[in-house]
Design a protein with these regions (language model features):
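Catalytic phosphate/metal-binding cores of nucleic-acid and nucleotide-processing enzymes, i.e., regions
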Residues: 2-122
Length: 122
């Protein structure tokens, strides 16, 4: 009898410049990011949330939040244990020195959003 394993799946999408592989893990992060954007817009009424292009600058955080005269970036991860891409630590650290930047995942979401609220209040 064959041993059962978890099913892993992926999708291939043709995009300008080549193929994009969409894995189950990528979908989990995308779903988390989508819900997070809705929550950010609810908390910070009138803010702009923009997705940044990591193919332009490798390691740049996923989201830029503009609110009144302040800004922040967030790098979304599907879990606290998710791997980081090259340069992500560098850019999150650099942008945190400039304003506010964090890695955010379901496990630390409330803590990060509370910190962001404090930053946007000052």
């Amino acid at each position: 009898m064959r041993e059962r394993t978890k099913n892993a799946f992926s999708f291939l999408f043709l995009q300008k410049g080549g193929w994009l592989v969409m894995t189950k893990e990528t979908k989990l992060e995308r779903d988390f990011q989508s819900k997070l954007i809705k929550e950010l817009k609810k908390i910070f009424v009138g803010c702009l949330v923009m997705k940044l292009d990591s193919s332009y600058i490798q390691g740049i955080p996923d989201l830029l939040i503009l609110y009144n005269n302040k800004w922040a970036t967030l790098e979304c991860k599907k879990s606290a244990k998710a791997s980081k891409r090259p340069n992500q630590d560098y850019y999150v650290g650099l942008m945190n020195k400039m304003s506010f930047s964090r890695f955010i995942c379901p496990e630390n979401k409330e803590e990060v959003l509370n910190e962001l609220q404090q930053t946007f209040k000052t």
